[in-house]
Amino acid sequence: MNVNNLVIEALRPCNLPVSPDFYDGDDDEYITFNYANEYPTNFGDNVPENDYSQLQIHYFARGKNPQSKRREIRKLLFKAGFDVSLGPINYESDTKKYHCVLEAGIDSVTNLEE
């Protein structure tokens, strides 16, 4: 299962650019995400049936309070089946943007047959 597509589709209602790893545009608001960890779960006959993917979701916003969009992102990810916890909100003085971090995780089917 491609977790990247799950994240992008889940966050589509935000109407913001969503990109894995980095964003190379010039929008004042955008979302990036990266894999923090991935490990096998639910073993049967010594073979994992699932992978648990842990991701960091980064929401960047310039010139506005990030709280409401941060809550929206959390709701959308949760609705899509992710476990979600809220991380810190930092202000980056060099870019003049708020940087919000959310931690998300999801179980997906391991397809070792492919």
What do these predicted regions represent?
Residues 1-54, 60-114:
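Long, contiguous binding/interaction regions
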